[in-house]
Amino acid sequence: MTKIYVSHPFGGLAKNKKNADSVLKWLQDDMGVFPIKEPFGSDTHNIFLSPIHMFGHLYNKVDYDTGINWCVDLLSGCDAIVMCNGWENSIGCNLELAYAKDHNIKVIHINELKAAKSIRLAVDAGMDKAIAALAGFAMLQALNKKAKEDLQRERAKSVN
């Protein structure tokens, strides 16, 4: 079993919780049973752990340091961390990423998983591996561009 920590911006906001719900559902439905050997190894039994779903209801009941320490404790027992879109603007996500890097926990960005899944599906459907890889790379570039644009819009809103 591969334990995968899901790092997603939260800040106690309902819209972030709703987005995290969608991400976790996609990961569990599509990636939990989808046998992608990379980036998580050959084990097809992925367990996705979301601190928002475990501790989110306590966001306004404990101080920030206590909450982030719980998150890091959870992360410390994981094999990998998935960084969800918007992590760049989140203090908590950045702390989790730094911890993961310092402790040799595999880091992957959600858009990389989406591209990997599309490549695998294309190859399984009979597409040439090289063509599927090019299509996956193009998809990854498009997803990253959209994530960057979303981040810029979010930053512009917070300035205004």
What are these regions (language model features)?
Residues 1-160:
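Conserved catalytic or regulatory cores that recognize and/or transform ribose-phosphate-containing ligands
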